[in-house]
């Protein structure tokens, strides 16, 4: 089988993977279960590869998957207003150029201690 079910229906699983992928692109490091980390690694690698392509079609494909969440918000004193950056903008303007010379392997999974409540194997997934 090419993917893990993660104990969810297909729509729930797809939504969870989209959320975790978006969170990883925004925060660049998240703590989750080992199985989830191994699954979102696939989607994050695809999103960064789309970001490296950088054309309109790649941007639209990434926009169809990445949630429209605010990645950062800055105050511009000269214009007296707030400017925000979405996860998609961060992917194409900050993350993708960082990996321009790298062919794959954009993420790292570090195993940590089991979760206290149910002893689920936990891991930290981060961008290299």
UniProtKB/Swiss-Prot annotation:
InterPro entries noted in UniProt: Ribosomal_bL17, Ribosomal_bL17_CS, Ribosomal_bL17_sf
Gene Ontology MF terms: structural constituent of ribosome
Positions of disulphide bridges: none
Gene Ontology CC annotations of this record: cytosolic large ribosomal subunit
Gene3D superfamilies named in the record: Ribosomal protein L17 (3.90.1030.10)
Alphabetical keyword list: Ribonucleoprotein, Ribosomal protein
GO annotation, biological process: translation
Family membership: Belongs to the bacterial ribosomal protein bL17 family.
Description of how the protein assembles with itself and partners: Part of the 50S ribosomal subunit. Contacts protein L32.
Name the record gives this protein: Large ribosomal subunit protein bL17
Organism listed in the record: Streptococcus pyogenes serotype M49 (strain NZ131)
Lineage: Bacteria, Bacillati, Bacillota, Bacilli, Lactobacillales
